[in-house]
Amino acid sequence: MAVFEGTFTQTEPLRLAIVIGRFNDLVTTKLLAGCQDCLKRHGVDPDPHGNQVDYVWVPGSFEVPLVARQLALTHRYDAIICLGAVIRGQTPHFDYVSAEVSKGIAAASFQTGVPVIFGILTVDTMQQALERAGIKANHGWDYAMNALEMASLMRQLRSNVTDSYTQTQSLPAAFPNASIGKLTAESEEV
């Protein structure tokens, strides 16, 4: 048997996309800066004119899952990082948006087999959001680390499945409904 664990050092030639909600951009731009700092320190070129990271700005967090799924369907990216901030107001709007964004990001990942990282802050106050975007810590850094680890792990798993298929001409028993290279609807239980 084998042990698989993602690494943070094998970043060439990783391709990442970052989807950022523009609403509450005082927070989301700080999350993005933390994310870019982490990527740069781990050998990923965050330059938007480079060839490793694409950036997509959307109106708000609610639009993030749709765009993340569309990007994941291209299979051009090793991971997609979703950044946004939903801050509770005095209406139930917060609950609806938070729930649908969470479900949508998870579905994008499950349906495509591409790691789609949940980097949406769901907080009660702007102060809490700012604390998580740089005053006390920057969760943008954490989201980038998650993306690096998951991209590495998924590459290892795909390589192992492909190697097993090449060696035995059949998929391992652990993946009875999977197909090489992409997941099918039958291979995932949500």
Swiss-Prot record:
Q: Which GO CC annotations does the UniProt entry carry?
A: cytosol; riboflavin synthase complex
| SUPFAM superfamilies xref list | Lumazine synthase (SSF52121)
Task: Please provide the record's keywords in A-Z order.
Answer: Riboflavin biosynthesis, Transferase
Where (2S)-2-hydroxy-3-oxobutyl phosphate is bound, by residue? 90-91, 132
One BP term from GO: riboflavin biosynthetic process
Binding locations of 5-amino-6-(D-ribitylamino)uracil: 23, 61-63, 85-87, 118
This entry's Enzyme Commission designation comes to: 2.5.1.78
Catalytic residues as annotated in Swiss-Prot or TrEMBL: 93 (proton donor)
Q: Which reaction does it catalyse?
A: (2S)-2-hydroxy-3-oxobutyl phosphate + 5-amino-6-(D-ribitylamino)uracil = 6,7-dimethyl-8-(1-D-ribityl)lumazine + phosphate + 2 H2O + H(+)
**Any GO MF annotation of the entry:** 6,7-dimethyl-8-ribityllumazine synthase activity
Question: Which pathway does it serve?
Answer: Cofactor biosynthesis; riboflavin biosynthesis; riboflavin from 2-hydroxy-3-oxobutyl phosphate and 5-amino-6-(D-ribitylamino)uracil: step 1/2
Keyword Hydrolase in the entry? The reply is no
Enumerate the HAMAP family for this protein: Lumazine_synth (MF_00178)
What family name appears in the similarity comment? Belongs to the DMRL synthase family.
Query: What this chain does, per the record?
Result: Catalyzes the formation of 6,7-dimethyl-8-ribityllumazine by condensation of 5-amino-6-(D-ribitylamino)uracil with 3,4-dihydroxy-2-butanone 4-phosphate. This is the penultimate step in the biosynthesis of riboflavin.
Q: What is this protein called?
A: 6,7-dimethyl-8-ribityllumazine synthase
